[in-house]
Amino acid sequence: MTSPDPREPRRPPEPFNPLFAIIGIGFVIVALLAAILVASLRDQHPNQTSWLPKAEHLEIAEKAFRSGDNEVAVKIFSELAAKNNATAQYWLAHMTELGLGVPRDPAKAIALYKKAAARNVVAAELRLGEIYLHGDLVPPDFGQAKAYLEEAAYYGDPRAAMLLGQMYRLGLGMSADPIEAYAWSEVASLEGSIFAKRERDASLGKLDTDKQQEAVARAAQILEQIKRETTGASAPSSK
């Protein structure tokens, strides 16, 4: 270990400033009081979550759902859904559709999905599109299916875009349109849908060279509209 060079001036020690110590102690006291308050609220209301922020409500409910604690999940989602929280309405619809923690009730599930979809929750729009397309809970309604799938697709959902491509290819509720079928399938493929590539290739075989160029241009037009819909917009699931 080298000794300091005696020729170098030594820096005098920093003077002690009691103000910093007081501020530090103050922060510690505030943190302790906050922790005591939260613990007190939790003890006083062990079955209530109203003292928590909404974002934390949702996080707790979603964790409970994924861990299989359906009773807790339903309780919190129901509280938030009653306050018109669209994300909670979607989750409660999902659980009601499947009968998780609540009696299975297709009509109530659809009503909740529609409330969430009205607030642009993309997952709710997609599920309603699937329900009306496949007749999962109600008789098929291709007009409703197309409307909800378009809403979800224009918010960038690849599965919704793929299903729209199928509808146009098969002519479900409309005349078959290979250009629209290719365009929507291409959009879904570019957005990450693996299955959409098969739909796109199936539509491609029905198009001559000129129509193929038209279909590619239509896909670009759709992508541009999706960009306009999603850029600068708040996350649909939180509206």
Residue ranges and their predicted role:
Residues 194-239:
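Terminal, low-structured helical/coil segments at or just beyond the last alpha-helical repeat
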Residues 66-75, 103-115, 139-148, 175-183, ...:
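Structural signature of tandem alpha-helical TPR/SEL1-like repeats
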Residues 30-71, 75:
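N-terminal leader/linker segments that initiate helical-solenoid repeat arrays
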Residues 79-80, 115-116, 150-152, 187-188:
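Canonical positions in the second alpha-helix
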Residues 57-64, 75-80, 89-98, 125-134, ...:
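Hydrophobic face of amphipathic alpha-helices that form TPR/SEL1-like repeat modules
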Residues 13-27:
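N-terminal Sec-pathway targeting helices
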